[in-house]
Amino acid sequence: MRSFVVVAGGLVLLLGAPRRVLSGQASRPFTLGADISYLDAPAVRGRAHRTYQENGKADDELSILMRHGWTSFRLRVFVSPVREAPDNSLANTIPLARRIKAAGGTFLLDIHYSDTWADPQHQEIPVAWRDLSFDSLEARVESYSREVIRTLKDSGAMPDWVQVGNEITRGTLWPLGQVHVPGAAQYNPPSGSDSTAQWDHLIRILKAGIRGVRAGAGNTPPRIAIHIDRGGDWATTEWFFDHLEAAHVDYDIIAQSFYPPWRHGTLEDLWKNMTECARRYHKDFLVAETGYEPTHSPDNPDMLWPVTPEGRLQFMVDLVNTVKKAGGIGVMYWAPEWDLWNADGTPGPAVFTLDHLKDLSARPASHVPPEVSGP
């Protein structure tokens, strides 16, 4: 394990300290996947539930994706979903998880530790947990995590990977587990400070969740992923995961979101982040969320591909090529129901990403980093 010292409020890695290397890291296969938590939702973005088809025959989204090489699938779970949120309760997650496992897919469980969306702007404590002391909250995170995994295991839907929290760049279970990103005023309240006490809370929450997941799994524990956003931001990634290393948090996968529409950087930024993570932490790297939809700011320099079905395919080919060449273990597209399908329910161009990767010479000029070239 590496050694860290605190200097002027920051973490410094001691050069020459022994480093833990993840056994077999280089040989792990790459996987293309998707977050399909919306699959059985009655409506997506105001549209009625879609009927899928291919080659003139009605089919299931999961089956079509797997037929085209998409083999990993992510499902989110809320504690007690509020009416405004999708009903991603554990009870509703189990049937879809069983379908993934029965089809031979890899299953990533995304535990939000909230009754609704948890992301860099929202990390609300579940209503039933709000009056707990911090010690009791820590214990509840562990027991809840254990119960979720044990229930899935008993239902024949054991996850292969588990995210302990979703996009927790600013922590989780606010305000008790909230931390504040240095130099990112848009992320932090004006009075925010990156205090030792807040980091202590976040570390204890993460360790409790990890203990619970492993206890619920028994002798076949899933791999643990820690997920933050901004996959092209090495400075924030280093700041966050250095804290976890200093506290000896035991996890397996660095998972990050990468959305050009949300100014997460270019593919060159992502490449730098991934290669620096490999050098510094020796963990597997997963792009746990991505997507390519219209940008929220017209001057966004990261929007290098047309926002069209063909442009989305170009983006996915470039992204997958970059992540594979950088040694990543996978890419997961968020909510493919939104924009990877044609209006008639047939698969759009990006569904065929892996087919196009077989002959990159036939693709238009790409936006991959200079280090990425060739098939």
Predicted regions, residues:
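Short, acidic/polar
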Residues: 47-66, 141-151, 233-245, 314-319
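Glycoside hydrolase catalytic-domain groove-lining segments
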Residues: 59-62, 200, 215-226, 231-302, ...
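Hydrophobic faces of well-ordered beta-strands that scaffold small-molecule active sites
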Residues: 30-36, 73-75, 107-111, 160-164, ...
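Substrate-binding cleft and catalytic face of glycoside hydrolase catalytic domains
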Residues: 63-198, 202-224, 229
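Active-site beta-loop-alpha junctions enriched in small/polar residues
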Residues: 37-39, 78-80, 112-116, 164-169, ...
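Aromatic-rich peripheral "rim/lid" segments of glycoside hydrolase catalytic domains that contact
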Residues: 44-50, 179-188, 272, 276-279, ...
